[in-house]
């Protein structure tokens, strides 16, 4: 995948629709994850969740109330290629901002924050990252958790690849791995689903931000997304989505600071 991305980058490819076309056609294609409750998941034939609601609100700000939002389901490894070949105009897909990804796409202001954490069975006695030596650990290609394991070979972690959260959970339940490394805001879902699991390492690596993304150098669309996010923050939309979706789902398992970045937006609007 990295080789393909490099070729596209060198060619200067940018297939995402520009802002003028989106506003003229009143259609915007937005990539969302297919299995990441409470952010985005396909249920009963349609997408729902925090990022889905946010994406639709942003689309209305950019185009108007009569916008047609085409939601495109993506897995982690799809996100950059879909933006580069025009299958999506914008990603609201739990996409962590990283220097590597910034070579190929442009990120908006963040709307969530997170940190890597580790899930294991209760009693597994994993107290520090070095305890993962020779442990089979589930990671999803295309994510920052996958990158973390690959960039720390000295830890001796035996990575087991899985396609998405649902696939990872099944493999864990089937005994194919000892642990699962992913962002804390997604790992909390596992402990809600299975009381035999625990967050054995709540912080692995550095704190991260999650943002929307557009194709590289699609500057007008990026500005429109940022303007929409600022406007929605000032109107209290983030607070509403937090109270309606995230707060009742997590029930205090994730600190509010990860899920609500109004302080960031308030500081930028001064």
Regions found by a protein language model. Give the residues of each.
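Sec-dependent N-terminal signal peptides
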Residues: 4-13
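Extracytoplasmic small-molecule ligand-binding "clamshell" domains
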Residues: 18-92
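Beta->alpha turn/N-cap motifs
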Residues: 32-36, 72-77, 86-98, 140-144, ...
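Periplasmic-binding protein-like
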Residues: 34, 112-120, 188-230, 248-270
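Bilobed "Venus flytrap"/periplasmic-binding protein-like clamshell domains
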Residues: 34-38, 47-62, 117-165, 184-185
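Extended ligand-binding regions for polar small-molecule ligands
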Residues: 53-57, 61-62, 130, 135, ...
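Acidic, polar ligand-binding/catalytic clefts
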Residues: 56, 60, 68-131, 198, ...
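A ligand-binding cleft/hinge motif common to bilobed small-molecule-binding domains
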Residues: 78, 94-103, 148-151, 171-206
């Amino acid at each position: 995948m990295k080789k393909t991305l490099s070729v596209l980058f060198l060619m200067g490819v940018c297939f995402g629709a520009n802002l003028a076309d989106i506003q003229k056609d009143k259609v915007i294609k937005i990539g969302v994850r297919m299995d990441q409750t409470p952010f985005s998941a396909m249920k009963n034939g349609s997408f729902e969740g925090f990022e889905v609601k946010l994406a639709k609100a942003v689309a209305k700000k950019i185009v108007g109330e009569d916008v047609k939002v085409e939601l495109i389901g993506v897995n982690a490894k799809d996100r950059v290629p879909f933006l580069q070949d025009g299958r999506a105009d914008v990603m609201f897909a739990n996409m962590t901002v990283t220097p590597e990804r910034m070579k190929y796409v442009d990120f908006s202001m963040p709307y969530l924050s997170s940190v890597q954490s580790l899930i294991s069975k209760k009693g597994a006695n994993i107290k520090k990252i070095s305890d993962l030596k020779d442990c089979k650990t589930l990671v999803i290609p295309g994510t920052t958790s996958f990158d973390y394991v690959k960039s720390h070979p000295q830890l001796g972690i035996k990575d087991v690849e899985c396609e998405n959260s649902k696939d990872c959970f099944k493999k864990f339940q089937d005994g194919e791995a000892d642990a699962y490394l992913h962002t804390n805001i997604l790992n909390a879902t596992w402990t809600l689903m299975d009381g035999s699991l625990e967050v054995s390492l709540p912080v692995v690596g550095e704190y991260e931000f999650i943002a929307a993304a557009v194709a590289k150098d699609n500057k007008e669309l990026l500005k429109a997304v940022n303007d929409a996010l600022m406007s929605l923050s000032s109107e209290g939309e983030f607070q509403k989505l937090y109270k309606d979706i995230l707060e009742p789902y997590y029930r205090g398992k994730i600190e509010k600071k990860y899920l609500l970045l109004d302080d960031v937006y308030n500081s930028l609007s001064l």
